[in-house]
Amino acid sequence: ARVYNQKNINFIIADFRGYGFSNGTPTAKNTKSDAHPVLDYVLWHLKKENYIGPLILMGRSLGSVSVLELAQRYPNDFRGLIIESGFANEEPLFRLFGMTPEQVGFKIEDGFQNGAKISKYQGPLLVIHAQQDHIIPFSQGEELLNLCPSKKKKLVPIPNANHNNILGVNPQKYFEEVERFIHALNKG
């Protein structure tokens, strides 16, 4: 968050239940439903403080589920979307645990449906993905970009980075791209 503040970008971070400093048990349902009260609070707070800048949603990895849920539900409440290391479908998550969706009786309609949600998103989109991501393959970032019908979209590959060190490998490129995206939204 310090780097964002140095660039005059306000940033609010929310953990999932059971992650970071948050208690509770993480579930697929909570991943989607918990995003709504967080956005409600953010919108209330921004209104209270007379904030006039653009609101941009950003989700990292599993956070792509939350921001795409919000993008589908509240498309007029924010101006842009940043997805870092996100996924279009759940297949990489199953592979991570050494199984296939079929082995556990998983059906696409039971999943997060990130691909279906991004295929309806028309606003500005920035996708940042590590090229050597060992958890969510780079091809998932490409798929998110390709499924999105927006005319204002960009994929930023981070070479030599994996899922967990994407910020540390080339922070200059990472933050330049985020800053460029945000400033373009401020002008538009």
Where do the protein language model's features map onto the residues?
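Short beta-strand/loop motif that positions the catalytic acidic residue
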Residues: 120-122, 127-129, 133
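Alpha/beta-hydrolase fold nucleophile elbow
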Residues: 48-61
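Alpha/beta-hydrolase active-site loop
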Residues: 26-48, 116
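Acidic catalytic loop of the alpha/beta-hydrolase fold
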Residues: 132-136, 163-165
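Short alpha-helix in the alpha/beta-hydrolase fold that links the catalytic acid
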Residues: 114, 123, 137-146
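Hydrolase active-site cap/lid region
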Residues: 66-123
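Catalytic histidine-centered segment of alpha/beta-hydrolase-like enzymes
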Residues: 161-175
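Conserved alpha/beta-hydrolase
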Residues: 1-23
